[in-house]
Amino acid sequence: MSILSFLLGEKKKSASVAKERLQIILAHERTGHSAPADYLPALQRELVAVISKYVKISDQDLRVSLERQDNLEVLEVKIEIPQN
């Protein structure tokens, strides 16, 4: 980070904001404070909003799921991008 960007401030990129949010969600989930289904719909809506800035997609084009196998958790995001 340069001194100029430090003094003037720098706007965070949407990718870094999304990464921070996912890290918070996963950390919260690992502590056992909420059921996984609680945040998945909100996460899906936010992802659609961010991706829609760059590619035209609908709510049905994006699917978010969380699977648990033993002590492994997998957050899966599937996005169907139109051919046009």
From Swiss-Prot:
Q: Which residues form the signal peptide?
A: none
GO BP terms: cell division; regulation of division septum assembly
Q: Name one Pfam family in it.
A: MinE
Q: Which domain of life is it from?
A: Bacteria
- Entry keyword set: Cell cycle, Cell division
Is the keyword DNA damage assigned to this protein? Answer: no
What InterPro entries does the record tag this protein with? MinE, MinE_sf
Q: What does this protein do?
A: Prevents the cell division inhibition by proteins MinC and MinD at internal division sites while permitting inhibition at polar sites. This ensures cell division at the proper site by restricting the formation of a division septum at the midpoint of the long axis of the cell.
Q: Which family does it belong to?
A: Belongs to the MinE family.
- What is the protein named? Cell division topological specificity factor
* The species this protein was found in: Cupriavidus pinatubonensis (strain JMP 134 / LMG 1197) (Cupriavidus necator (strain JMP 134))
Gene that produces this protein: minE
